[in-house]
Amino acid sequence: MNLILLGAPGAGKGTQAEVISEHLHIPTVSTGNIIREALKNGTEMGHKAKEFIDSGRLVPDEVVIGIIRERLAQPDCQNGFILDGFPRTIPQAEALDRMGTAIDRVINIEVADEDITRRVSGRRVCPGCGNTYHLDYKRPQKEGVCDKCGDTLVQRRDDRPETVRERLQVYHEQTEPLKRYYAAAGKLVMVEGQDEVEDTTRLTLEALDGIEPLSPT
């Protein structure tokens, strides 16, 4: 079973990808993770990707697609996979089609922009130990201080409201059209993202109704 997870940045795709991976016993292929792996390993495409990442530009399709192709050819993807973070654009979706990779279902996690902005901008991170907190859902015992190591919590640049709004604008312009693309192919399933992660998980698993899990290996 080959799946794609769609949704705006901050919609909770990564969390739900983990749930689906455990439920169906298939790997999650996260664009961010495999690009970081290519950077770490110093591959040719990893070097190319680094040039764009360092300058704050999107990694071009030919580099991303090459990295995706290599990952999907690995043995653990032969019985299915979950794509998280790819495709991001219609041309990328078309390139995926040209690869001959059949996609069985596309799950879109729908969350309103204002809810995403609230979720993401409320995050706080400890630069010392990496613990994460949230001003609404997971507050530290002492305001602004990490419970674990006592370091001062910070807000990452990517979590600032103005940055979140910019990322959402890019999503609406470049990625949201994929909903129509996959709906036209009869593969799109919409899931309304909820405030509670468990509620979103329940709806996500319902969207997988009829898909039999593989035997764990």
Describe these PLM feature segments:
Residues 1-217:
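Glycine-rich phosphate-binding loop of ATP-dependent small-molecule kinases
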